[in-house]
Amino acid sequence: MSFFGFGQSVEVEILLNDAESRKRAEHKTEDGKKEKYFLFYDGETVSGKVGLALKNPNKRLEHQGIKIEFIGQIELYYDRGNHHEFVSLVKDLARPGEITQSQAFDFEFTHVEKPYESYTGQNVKLRYFLRATISRRLNDVVKEMDIVVHTLSTYPELNSSIKMEVGIEDCLHIEFEYNKSKYHLKDVIVGKIYFLLVRIKIKHMEIDIIKRETTGTGPNVYHENVTIAKYEIMDGAPVRGESIPIRLFLAGYELTPTMRDINKKFSVRYYLNLVLIDEEERRYFKQQEVVLWRKGDIVRKSMSHQAAIASQRFEGTTSLGEVRTPSQLSDNNCRQ
């Protein structure tokens, strides 16, 4: 790796102690590509070595100290100059002096708190990384290594179904039902649509999974909606009394757990959007929020006791009632 200034005189490498056995997870980068990173959980220890290799053994490397940091950081893309750190740990590896030969320094961050899931979105990025720094008078030599953190949950104690009647007065009246209000990322959404009244010519019906990313606070709030999936549940005109089944597998889509008010910087919520299209290409829709969570039934053997406890947490939301009172889909709030 090349460095600014004195980068050509020394190479810095960060090695984890359990690199051979630790699982890797795919994570989307800022440019949309997927790469694999070492996977960690809340409460796990992060330990390893910082290796320094002199490119010219006959030259000495003077420095003002060597350190390694473990950092959890949120970056808002519209405010690139400011990085909001919610975890910042530092270990000094060497006092000011000279490096005369290649050597390695051990480090250990014990039971590190990693409260949030790694996330790369439309307007925000939450990342964890190790940063090794050789302080120099002019230019520091810096090496960073990103890791990925997953937040684990067990099955929520309360997980009521969602039932709702919606319609347009004297034109369309339907009842839809989803079997749960909270789904893990590999779950299956099971439900049904029942037509109580059909007086308009519906030709198509689908369910969309929508991710809504909210960043900022107060007047500087940005909302970004991304359609993750479109699932066709009907093609053709329904009749009164007809029931349409729903079975949507989540495992094939790029989803994250629901994230609410993360460090007071951003939120990520998911919605099921029921869309009906009539023969005149008018669109009617009804959105319903669902909670997504990462299943944590299998806990890594190498996880600490603290990490195992953390894996049992579930960040719930306001419970969704089993039955909703009928609501109307009007021209103003139901057509896209």
UniProtKB/Swiss-Prot annotation:
Source organism per entry reads: Pongo abelii
Q: Cross-referenced Pfam families, in alphabetical order? A: Vps26 (PF03643)
**What's the gene?**
VPS26B
Q: Which domain of life is it from?
A: Eukaryota
| Protein's GO biological process | intracellular protein transport
Q: Which PANTHER family match?
A: VACUOLAR PROTEIN SORTING 26 RELATED (PTHR12233)
UniProt xrefs under InterPro entries: Arrestin-like_C (IPR014752), Vps26-related (IPR028934)
Keyword Repeat set for record? no
Record's family? Belongs to the VPS26 family.
Q: Where does it reside?
A: Cytoplasm; Membrane; Early endosome; Late endosome
| Disulfide pairings | none
Membrane-crossing residue ranges in chain numbering: none
- What is known about what this protein does? Acts as a component of the retromer cargo-selective complex (CSC). The CSC is believed to be the core functional component of retromer or respective retromer complex variants acting to prevent missorting of selected transmembrane cargo proteins into the lysosomal degradation pathway. The recruitment of the CSC to the endosomal membrane involves RAB7A and SNX3. The SNX-BAR retromer mediates retrograde transport of cargo proteins from endosomes to the trans-Golgi network (TGN) and is involved in endosome-to-plasma membrane transport for cargo protein recycling.
> What name does the UniProt record give this protein?
Vacuolar protein sorting-associated protein 26B
- Quote a single Gene Ontology cellular component term: late endosome
Q: What does the record say about its membrane topology?
A: Peripheral membrane protein
Q: Which residues carry this modification: Phosphoserine?
A: S302, S304, S319
Listed A to Z, the keywords are: Cytoplasm, Endosome, Membrane, Phosphoprotein, Protein transport, Transport
